Amino acid sequence: MIDKNFWQGKRVFVTGHTGFKGSWLSLWLTEMGAIVKGYALDAPTVPSLFEIVRLNDLMESHIGDIRDFEKLRNSIAEFKPEIVFHMAAQPLVRLSYEQPIETYSTNVMGTVHLLETVKQVGNIKAVVNITSDKCYDNREWVWGYRENEPMGGYDPYSNSKGCAELVASAFRNSFFNPANYEQHGVGLASVRAGNVIGGGDWAKDRLIPDILRSFENNQQVIIRNPYSIRPWQHVLEPLSGYIVVAQRLYTEGAKFSEGWNFGPRDEDAKTVEFIVDKMVTLWGDDASWLLDGENHPHEAHYLKLDCSKANMQLGWHPRWGLTETLGRIVKWHKAWIRGEDMLICSKREISDYMSATTR
């Protein structure tokens, strides 16, 4: 699993470090002693986890657009990283209907820019390309998708992630082929996670942030698709998988340069209705929800991942169940409302996760 000693002094470059997942990953890496530089647009929300935990004081932060190839290349070349996590993205399904050009240019060409930079700069040993479970051609199957299933995507966001996977595959085959690993020395993996939730997410049109905003303002939560099933998991679950993949790529790049799924156990793939009912109970104070009867852009109703490969080959397993995850989210958010030091609270969350046993 995660080897904290491995990360001591490692030079790590994170794109998208100002986002929800990127902030949690950057904080975790700095906690383990890594020297971290981030490259991203300004924090996408106000408030943001990046600002609240004062990440600017813990790492080098370069504000820039992943679509600006020269700026990205110069930033990476100056830093000379050993490991790269590529998270920069337009991450919202509904926004992708409104901004398809920006979604594709960021998620597809951004990936091209990152991988071309890795090819040109050299001396980078491990690249973890973060996409999404929505990269798969979703047929609303009752079983989970495996890493060798076809890429697809109904909406611009999901399809852009499928395209990003194809980009990574092409670069791996053409420039970072495991068969020629001794020549190039680069391990390149793509990682795919389900619906990631946790404290510190204020994004628009995401279920948990929408619920918390409504509760905080004493308003009913408006729910679009109560019967949609998603593979819900605490943000630290897939991040732990990404970290393990990076470790393996660094030491055995040829063996682990492929796609990896990171999702919850089957019993934690629950309906939206289940989530909101649990959150109502955990929050208390007369919290409630209401069904939105309006028509909305298409979103998948059923999507699960098969994580057998990560379980068997990486020794990765989920540690927190859905009920504990939701409880931790409410606890984290109420601590923020009370004005507690969220850097301390977030470090404690990481420590709790690291010490938890697999379920």
Swiss-Prot record:
GO terms for molecular function: CDP-glucose 4,6-dehydratase activity. Pathway: Nucleotide-sugar biosynthesis; CDP-3,6-dideoxy-D-mannose biosynthesis; CDP-3,6-dideoxy-D-mannose from CTP and alpha-D-glucose 1-phosphate: step 2/5; Bacterial outer membrane biogenesis; LPS O-antigen biosynthesis. Keywords: Lipopolysaccharide biosynthesis, Lyase, NAD. GO terms for biological process: O antigen biosynthetic process. It catalyses: CDP-D-glucose = CDP-4-dehydro-6-deoxy-D-glucose + H2O. The keyword Lyase applies. Its EC number is 4.2.1.45. It comes from the Bacteria. InterPro entries: CDP_4_6_deHydtase, NAD(P)-bd_dom, NAD(P)-bd_dom_sf. Its cofactor is NAD(+). It holds the Pfam family GDP_Man_Dehyd. It is an enzyme of class 4 (lyase). The keyword Cell membrane does not apply. Belongs to the NAD(P)-dependent epimerase/dehydratase family. This is CDP-glucose 4,6-dehydratase. It comes from Salmonella typhimurium (strain LT2 / SGSC1412 / ATCC 700720).
